[in-house]
């Protein structure tokens, strides 16, 4: 019975793996390369703590504390592209409830998740365009537009309490994302007075109609030695706020090597997206990151993506900027085109004023 339940619940990732492994073997004349070459880990991985920031110093502190907190976030955004937040206002009980609802959602049969139109048909798994194991993500997710969560046409099936929990989580993580983004913007421009309302003009065009909440599950993987949970990438947004469980598996590129992020209970992870790097004239870094597969246990996470409308001009914190003007829609279209034609995302180098990317 347990084996049948696993087959019914999980997407056919093993089938994708075997097909890609066979394709790779055929290309290499019947000899598969070592697993570490497939994953591209580049040797031993250090486990590190991300810079830790107490957000309450920004939201409730005096002028000196607000300035120090914003400065700490700006340094982390410049040096790491990632940091963690404590005292962020997203309650432990709410996130535990979100994990319970998330687990119930992902325990549904694969056919139900894929075909029934749950959560506005936002279900996805693996990578349908993968042509090698380097492009395969051992994961499934619901990538839900915020506006859809409260929509009458968004089907939650029998998960009657999921809508309310997702709405609460989205609202709480939205407050965090906008507070952090405004403070980071103020550090570069000197505008505003600190806190969530410091720079209402930034990020331009970002509101509940343009942002996304993503529910992720990384199933235990029997091929964890040579499979990614999520392939290396940067985020095509302004800023991402992540709530992860204690399983671990998030890795980021630091000083030209992969670093494993040590999970911290009750902390949120923040990372800079491509659009913020462009807006900041490369002061803040959108850093490549990945999730490694786990052979023994599932991993769950919830991510909030702060995105503008497709017609929003990304802009700059000040001239001269190394990037030409572009909209979010133009950026997404180019990313999708590159992935389709080359198998990988090129991203910001396409938008340098004097780009050499062909």
Swiss-Prot record:
Free-text tissue specificity from the UniProt record: Expressed in panicles. Expressed at low levels in young shoots, leaf blades and elongating internodes.
CC cofactor: L-ascorbate; Fe(2+)
Enzymatic class: oxidoreductase
Protein origin, superkingdom: Eukaryota
GO MF entries: gibberellin 2-beta-dioxygenase activity; metal ion binding
Subcellular location: Cytoplasm; Nucleus
Record domain Fe2OG dioxygenase: where: 207-308
EC number: 1.14.11.13
Main localization (coarse): cytoplasm
Cofactor: how and how many bound: Binds 1 Fe(2+) ion per subunit.
Residues binding Fe cation, per UniProt: 233, 235, 289
InterPro entries hit by this protein: DIOX_N, IPNS-like_FE2OG_OXY, IPNS-like_sf, Iron_ascorbate_oxido_reductase, Oxoglu/Fe-dep_dioxygenase_dom
Function description: Catalyzes the 2-beta-hydroxylation of several biologically active gibberellins, leading to the homeostatic regulation of their endogenous level. Catabolism of gibberellins (GAs) plays a central role in plant development. In vitro, converts GA12 and GA53 to the corresponding 2-beta-hydroxylated products GA110 and GA97, respectively.
Similarity comment text for this entry: Belongs to the iron/ascorbate-dependent oxidoreductase family. GA2OX subfamily.
Protein name: Gibberellin 2-beta-dioxygenase 6
Organism expressing this protein natively: Oryza sativa subsp. japonica (Rice)
